[in-house]
Amino acid sequence: MATNSTQETNKQLVQASFDHWGRGEGSPFDLLIPDVEWVIVGSSPLSKTYHSKQEFIDQVRIPFNARMAKPLVPTVHGIYADGDMVIVLFDLDAIGHDGLPYHNNYTWYLQMKDARVFKVIAFFDTQKFDEFWTRVRPKP
């Protein structure tokens, strides 16, 4: 169980990472350890457990971002900490290469140790995600 000061530090680190992401200066992915366990919950073909930062980035993040005409912009609605877990409620908005918007609601459960994220459980509307993934082809 994390101490109150560790809990608050973790929350502040995650808040700062989302602030940086919103300004295009970094992202929460910078907090991931190399062998992070990233779980996408749902029925999407991409819903599964990824066993490293690189696996997740190569199979999800890079091809997803390659479908965007402009970078994803997060809108954070709340960040909560309990023990070693930081929970983030946020939306992502962007425009795809087809000119149509992408919008989805996300909840990430970030489990932390030593100021780094070692496990993520991600919830979002996988149907919206899949529709976008299928509709928009990635650009190199």
Regions found by a protein language model. Name each.
Residues 12-21, 45-50, 63-67, 89-90:
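Short, mixed-charge, low-aromatic patches
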Residues 3-7, 45-53, 99:
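Alpha-helix initiation/capping motif
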Residues 33-81:
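A solvent-exposed, acidic/Ser-Thr-rich amphipathic alpha-helical stretch
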Residues 2-6, 64-140:
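A beta-strand edge to alpha-helix "cap/lid" segment located at domain peripheries
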